Amino acid sequence: MSFAFFFPGQGSQSLGMMNGFAEHALVKNTFDEASAILGQDLWAMINGSDAEIIGQTVNTQPIMLAAGVAVYRAYLEVGGKTPAAVAGHSLGEYTALVAAEALDFADAVKLVRLRAELMQSAVPQGVGAMAAILGLEDEQVRQICAESAQGEVVEAVNFNSPGQVVIAGNAAAVGRTMAAAKEAGAKRALPLPVSVPSHCSLMKPAADKLAEALKTVEIKQPQIRVIHNADVVAYDDAGKIKDALVRQLYSPVRWTETVNALVSDGIAESAECGPGKVLAGLAKRINKAAAGSALTDAGQITAFIEAH
């Protein structure tokens, strides 16, 4: 049976998040590779006691990249089969490209650190915000954003599952949208603890700089189909892949469509490759035919391989 691998983005990090892979030297070695490139000990960070440090986007992005690549390498090391397709949520798209051998891991580490710095500097602290709107239709959320903008930016940026949409933009506009969403019958409107309003048009200046940086990065033809966030399609051409990564910074993550497209293609089963179980849970909520596993420790990897 064909299956897809999903790679998580920011928000799935936690202290001790790789404890389930203590026996896999390859996992720590992968973190050591990334640490050597950045001149920082990422392994010590995730095994320390300061959750705030790993929650800073400049650290979270390389940590989550290393985690996803490490788990994928551990899976292959013990004889796991190649997935039919891969996709990553936001930052996870870079991990997916590494897994598909389109992007060198060392290049990806540098790129995601730069991506984080560009995102952080595009919008000063306190100016932007993000919030999750639960219990409304996608189109309702889009409409409320348009009505609440009042000359500022507020956009629907993550379509995570039916009834779960994340918005981002100027803090005041996000606040107005949250209030209007509650009035419109949203079950909840929750501010997210992030410093950067990802995937909205406030990220365009960062995207322009990312495009410059990508000019010097080699992208090879993917060996596995990579479904891109911005378009919900796969590309073989390096130029198109780079363009998709640039547009991803200021375009919505179309996760609901991604899962549905794979199910329509006969790929209903998926495994989340990295810490956390967010994407595995979303798959089941998006499509009743979808089945999601989470490879959160060595035992889960073994169980998944035995079942496939």
Where do the model's predicted regions map?
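Alpha/beta catalytic cores of group-transfer enzymes, especially the acyltransferase/condensing modules
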Residues: 10-12, 38, 100-251
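FabD-like malonyl-/acyl-CoA
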Residues: 1-140, 192, 269-299
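Non-catalytic positions within long, well-ordered alpha-helices that form the structural scaffold/packing
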Residues: 76, 182, 263-266
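Short alpha-helix immediately C-terminal to the canonical SAM-binding loop
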Residues: 174, 280, 302
